[in-house]
Amino acid sequence: MKVVYFSFSGNVRRFIKRSEISDVMEITKDNCTDPFEEPYILVTGTIGFGEVPKEVQSFLEINHHNLRAVAASGNRNWGQNFAKAGRTISEEYHVPLLMKFEVQGSNKDVIEFKNKVGHFNENYEREKVQSY
């Protein structure tokens, strides 16, 4: 399953690169309104006072039907708004919040993310096979 991500300041991009997951796509201003026709896990940062970035909002308006899970980055200095974009997306689109990580994530966060994506993919593939 593809990992789709948005990186406002480069932190999420660095996190994804460190994860060494190869099946990825970056959301940009240029492609945020393009249709995306396959299941994906979304990774996004949080901006302002816990908001979902506009590019991610635009992407989800068109492509929410293929969203399977979300992970979010943030800064703990924002207290209850830490990585709030992930919780907002999870609640709005009824998908699991895989994890929250600070800024570009620690090595432990990267390992946790890879493991969760791997388990999520295994379960998704199993469900897909059982539906045939």
Curated annotation (Swiss-Prot):
A GO biological-process term: protein modification process
Source taxon at top rank: Bacteria
GO MF, any single term: FMN binding
One Pfam family this sequence matches: Flavodoxin_NdrI
Protein function: Probably involved in ribonucleotide reductase function.
Protein family membership: Belongs to the NrdI family.
Full protein name: Protein NrdI
Natural source organism: Staphylococcus haemolyticus (strain JCSC1435)
Gene from which this protein is expressed: nrdI
